[in-house]
Every structure is written in structure tokens, then in C-alpha cells.
């Protein structure tokens, strides 16, 4: 069976390379598309695609495998056996965890999208660990690559689950909305801690307020802060993603669920930092 899989993988790699070759004629591309389409329609194509995805270094094959898996997730998911769904879910998560620092961004983002699409159907009933996986990635003190991945997953989750498309039932859309609202206090607190860490604050579990505590009162002065210009590239990248997540959350969630005085203070600090950066650039250029 392994030899058959290897032979099929080599054949697929050759087909994909031929398809994207500038020397390939349109008629030949049409033939290849028909072959690939016939393969994708097979009921066991998902299992082959998991093998192809985890065994190739060919980006075309990776993307074809993910696109085929996307079809199963969108069109056949409910009718699949639970064990098969779990295998797809586990393999995609493991592959993303192992390759998110080396895979091209378009492949990484596709993986994130498929995992969130699975959660759209399975969370929390068959995929209870979905949100805890994301939150573990965005913990303060994690590696920049893990934080970036977690924030990308948070943004995609907000886009897909906070404002679900019309291709799911009304009851499921309402359930997802409620589930997302329940997660917002912890998400907001995490985003604030990441933004504060980017500005240089010493943030620790012992000194940070819990998500349930009302420790964001405007009467409580913020801890002292010293910001050096410019921000490090990692801090800047993390801050940009954090702010994108905050902006999208506010596009659908009530402000009372995700806005605290602590978040507002931090946003003002970033606004002031941007002004200082512009002034500094002007003085240097002048």
C-alpha cells in the first residue's frame, strides 16, 4: 500500500508540475484538470490527500490536497464517519503545528481556514479543544511564530464563526454566535496582554488581572511604561495582528463583551507611539 501511495504521489507531482509549466498547452491542461477532478470525486480521496500533504515538498501538490480536503469538509463532512473526520482534523492540526514556520503563507492560511471550517461544524461537540488550542498559541511569552499563528487563527475564527455565512442553519449560526461571545472576555484579556507586552510592559500571570476581575477601572493608574522606538519587528507584527483581531471583533460583537478601559488605554498608547514615530521620522529626514 505504501508503494502504491508513493507511486501515486510521484504521478501527481509530475502532473502538477506539467500543469503549471508554461510549455503545457491549454488542451493538455484541460486533460489534467479532468483527471484531477475524477480523482477528487472518489470517496477515499481525502485519505490519499492526507498522505500527499504530509509526504510531499511540492507546493502545487500541497495546495491541490488542501483544496480536495476542502471539498470534503464543505460538502461531505456530515456524512463521514466520526473516525475519518477525527483523522482529517488531527492530521491538519499536526501538519500546521509542524510546518507553520516553514510553509508558504498561502498554504499556512489555507490550513488555518480548513481547521476553522471544521470547527464551524464540530465545535464544541466533536472538537471541544478547538479554542483552547488557539489560546495556548497566543499566550504571552510564547515564540513569535506561535503567537502569529494563534492570532491568525483568532482572526479567521472571528471572520468565520463570529459572522457565519448563510450556508449553515439559523440555529447553528446562533449557537456559534453565543459560543464566540462566551470566549470574548478571555480573548480580549489575552489581546491586551500581548499589546502591552509589545509596548514593553512587564506582564506576568501573577500581576495580570484575571479575565473575570473588574481590574480595568479607569481609576486605577496604568503601570509605568517605557517604550523604545522603533518597536522590534516581532512586536510590530504581533501588534498589527492584535489590532486586526480587535477591529474585527468590534465589527460584530457588542463593545461590552470585548472593550475594557485597559484596552482603551493600550490603544491610546499605540496611537501616541505612532505619532511619536512619525515625528521622529520627520526630524530625522529634516
Residue ranges and their predicted role:
Residues 1-46:
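N-terminal alpha-helical scaffolding segments that mark the starts
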Residues 5-9, 41-49, 84-100, 123-147, ...:
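Amphipathic alpha-helical segments within extended alpha-helical solenoids and repeat-rich scaffolds
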Residues 6-10, 39-44, 72-75, 159, ...:
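Alpha-helix capping and inter-helical loop/turn segments
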Residues 28-36, 64-73, 106-116, 145-161, ...:
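Amphipathic alpha-helical elements of HEAT/ARM-like alpha-solenoid repeat scaffolds that form extended
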Residues 42, 74-76, 117, 121, ...:
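Alpha-solenoid helical repeat scaffolds
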Residues 58-102, 109:
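Eukaryotic helix-linker segments that join adjacent hydrophobic helices
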Residues 205, 243-246, 251-264:
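Extended alpha-helical solenoid scaffold regions that build the rod-like backbones
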